[in-house]
């Protein structure tokens, strides 16, 4: 069997998580065990209401001890949240083993690395030593120095226009 591949969906445009979720639904529809792990989001996004009910689809609960965005946290809060993110990564690795996943989606993991909450080297080590049949999708603003050379696919979502630029808020059912 051919070794599974690594995908990165990055950029400042909308659609990274949407593309990753779309691929995960396709894989699940083919009978693949899927693990979805969201790193910097709470577990209230609308798609989770559907995904949690799919057979062979496993969601690793995100760390949600704060209502703040990371940029709003003080140094102590960032340190504590970073510990939770590292534990979340360990839980994700265990879920891959437990469910014999063939697809792993790590949503916003690249941003967790960029913010210093997760080691780029630890992520790259996992990618290099993952099971041969584990396809991996990672999302975030930009590939990291260690993940960039490991990726087979890198797709950049570019923002041309976004309602947020006009001060409009995210909408239930569309953005979350």
Which residues fall in each region the model found?
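Catalytic phosphate/metal-binding cores of nucleic-acid and nucleotide-processing enzymes, i.e., regions
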Residues: 1-5, 132
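Conserved P-loop
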Residues: 4-94
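Hydrophobic/aromatic ligand-binding patch that stacks against planar heteroaromatic rings
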Residues: 26, 50, 126, 146-147
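Hydrophobic anchor at the start of a short beta-strand
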Residues: 34, 136, 154
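Conserved nucleotide-binding/hydrolysis micro-motifs of P-loop NTPases
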Residues: 40-43, 65-67, 110-111, 142-145, ...
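Phosphate-binding/switch loop-helix module in NTP-utilizing enzymes
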Residues: 72-132
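Sensor-1/coupling segment of RecA-like P-loop NTPase cores
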Residues: 128-144
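Phosphate-binding/switch region of NTP-binding enzymes
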Residues: 141-176
